[in-house]
Amino acid sequence: MKRRAILFFLLFLLQMGSVPTLAAEPTVAAQGAALIDGKTGRLLWGKNADAPLAMASTTKIMTAILVLEQASLTEVVTVSKNAAQQPKVHMSLQEGEQWQAGALLSAMLLRSYNDAAVALAEQVSGDVAKFCAEMTKKAKEIGARDTVFGSPNGLDSHLTAEQHHSTAYDMALIGAYALENETFREIIAQQEIHVSDLTGKHPCSVTNADRFLQEYSGALGIKTGYTNRAGHCFVGAAERDGVRLVSAVLGSGWGDAGKQKKWTDTKALMDYG
């Protein structure tokens, strides 16, 4: 009799819609993926979330954090030979050019310019090696569990996996931390900007490479990445009804298929959340 009463009660709840249905597990191609609560850092879903992987240009999120916390956006950056020689993607900075730090930061975040990242790193710390050590230290302070930076722009062909790696969880956590900075949020939300060096002789129109920002309701954006080692990567964020979710997908694939997969992986994670 007791079992029958319980059964009738459960049937009643189902009819009333009071029994919550569990969201379907997301299908994600990425080698490593994480979805976290953007306010608490709690892991909501993961796939190899703590596996050390290359993270490509999502690295530049941490570069931006240090620039925002340690430099003035109006200070003048003089481009070094090292910065000017960085490979594509670059904004063709020339040795000796002078730019405001804010212009380089915005261009770096929107279009992933490698030369801008190095110029900013040298401005903040004097040289790239010192800047990378500060990046790694900051990651630990934020709560990252297995992240080492050997490059301010994410290029990794000259580095071993031990010298430059992170995890999907750590990159999501770093992304969530960056979003607490209002200037960071304002920069990544822009669709297009126009910047120039101080002389006005090197104008540059920069469009945002983040498709997620346009294709997903509530998207806040953040940062794409790709190297031959890392594959296509993306750290993304969205906010609806006051709930902020941050995701990271590392190694979503290679070639055109991988480029598309990082978007579908991210959307699947956000839909699950």
Task: Give the label of every model feature segment.
Residues 144-145, 159-273:
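Domain-terminus/edge residues, biased toward the C-terminal soluble/receptor-binding domains
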Residues 15-16, 72, 269:
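Hydrophobic alpha-helical membrane context
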Residues 21-182:
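Active-site-adjacent loops and short helices of periplasmic peptidoglycan-processing enzymes
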Residues 4-5, 37, 157, 267:
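Catalytic-site microenvironment of enzymes
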